[in-house]
C-alpha cells in the first residue's frame, strides 16, 4: 500500500468524504492498491452517506451493474436520485434513463423527461439526444418536432452521431416547419449548413435560412438567438454568397407557396 493510500485511509476513517471517495476510486481502478470492488463499494457508500454527490452517483452505478455487490436496481435508483437532486449531471441522465425503461422504478416518461432535461441543461450530449427523441415521439412531453430538431442540432454540432442520424431522418419535417414560419426550425436549417451537418457547409444556405427566419418567421420566444445569427451571417458572409442566398430565398418562397 503506497504512502498516498495510507494517508487517504487515515482521512477516510475520520469521515473525510473526499478522502473516502478518492479511496473508493483507488480500490475500483486498482490505482496504488490492488483492485477490490467490495472495498470500493464500502467507501463510496461512506462518502455517499455524507452527502457527496459524485460518490452517490458512482454507488448507483455499482449497484446497477453489480460491481462489488449483487445487482440491485432499486438501490441504484435511490442513490442516483440522491445525486440527481444535488445536480450531479451524470446521475440526472442515469435516473432519467431508468425512469424511461422502468429499471428499478416504475416506468414514467414524465419523470424521464424531467431528469433528462436537467442533465441536458448542464450539457450532457446523450441527455440532449434522448430528450430530443422524447420530443420526437411525444413521450413525457408534448410531441414537438421543432423542439426535437433544436435539441438534435445542438448535440450533432458537438459530434453526437445518433442526433446527426435523427436530423437526417426527419429533415423534411424540419424544413416544412421552417417554411411554415418556425424561427427555431429555420435556425436549425441554418446551423445544418453552417456546420455541415450531414451535408457540405454552405454559407449561402446559412444566410438564406437566417433571412427567412427574420422575414417570415413567427418568433414567440427571446429574440436574442435570431439577432445573434443575423449579426453572425452579416459579418462572415461574402457578397457572392449573399447574392446566391437571395436567390435561394426566392426559391424558398416558391416552396412555401406550394405548401399553402
Feature names for model-found ranges:
Residues 190, 201-203, 210:
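Predominantly extracellular beta-rich ligand-binding scaffolds that present long acidic/polar faces
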Residues 1-3, 11, 169, 173-180, ...:
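Terminal, low-structured helical/coil segments at or just beyond the last alpha-helical repeat
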Residues 19, 55, 91, 127, ...:
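The tetratricopeptide repeat
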Residues 22-29, 33, 58-65, 69, ...:
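Hydrophobic face of amphipathic alpha-helices that form TPR/SEL1-like repeat modules
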Residues 184-188, 206:
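Amphipathic alpha-helical protein-interaction segments enriched in hydrophobic
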Residues 13-16, 29-31, 36, 49-52, ...:
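Short helix-capping/linker turns of helical repeat alpha-solenoids
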Amino acid at each position: 500500500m503506497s504512502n498516498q493510500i495510507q494517508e487517504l485511509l487515515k482521512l477516510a476513517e475520520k469521515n473525510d468524504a473526499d478522502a473516502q471517495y478518492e479511496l473508493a476510486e483507488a480500490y475500483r481502478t486498482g490505482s496504488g492498491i490492488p483492485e477490490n470492488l467490495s472495498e470500493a463499494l464500502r467507501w463510496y457508500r461512506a462518502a455517499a452517506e455524507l452527502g457527496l454527490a459524485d460518490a452517490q452517483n458512482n454507488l448507483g452505478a455499482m449497484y446497477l451493474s453489480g460491481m462489488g455487490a449483487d445487482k440491485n436496481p432499486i438501490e441504484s435508483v435511490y442513490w442516483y436520485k440522491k445525486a440527481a437532486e444535488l445536480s450531479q449531471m451524470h446521475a440526472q441522465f442515469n435516473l432519467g434513463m431508468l425512469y424511461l425503461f422502468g429499471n428499478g422504478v416504475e416506468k414514467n416518461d414524465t419523470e424521464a423527461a424531467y431528469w433528462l432535461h436537467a442533465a441536458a441543461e448542464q450539457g450532457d450530449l446523450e441527455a440532449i439526444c434522448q430528450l430530443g427523441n422524447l420530443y420526437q415521439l411525444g413521450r413525457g412531453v408534448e410531441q414537438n418536432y421543432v423542439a426535437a430538431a433544436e435539441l438534435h442540432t445542438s448535440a450533432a454540432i458537438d459530434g453526437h452521431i445518433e442526433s446527426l442520424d435523427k436530423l437526417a431522418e426527419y429533415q423534411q419535417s424540419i424544413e416544412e416547419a421552417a417554411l411554415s414560419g418556425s424561427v427555431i426550425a429555420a435556425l436549425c436549417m441554418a446551423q445544418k449548413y453552417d456546420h455541415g451537418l450531414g451535408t457540405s457547409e454552405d454559407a449561402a444556405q446559412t444566410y438564406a435560412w437566417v433571412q427567412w427566419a427574420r422575414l417570415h418567421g413567427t418568433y414567440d420566444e427571446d429574440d436574442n438567438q435570431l439577432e445573434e445569427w443575423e449579426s453572425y451571417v452579416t459579418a462572415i458572409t461574402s457578397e457572392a454568397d449573399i447574392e446566391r442566398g437571395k436567390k435561394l430565398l426566392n426559391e424558398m418562397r416558391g416552396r412555401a407557396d406550394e405548401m399553402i
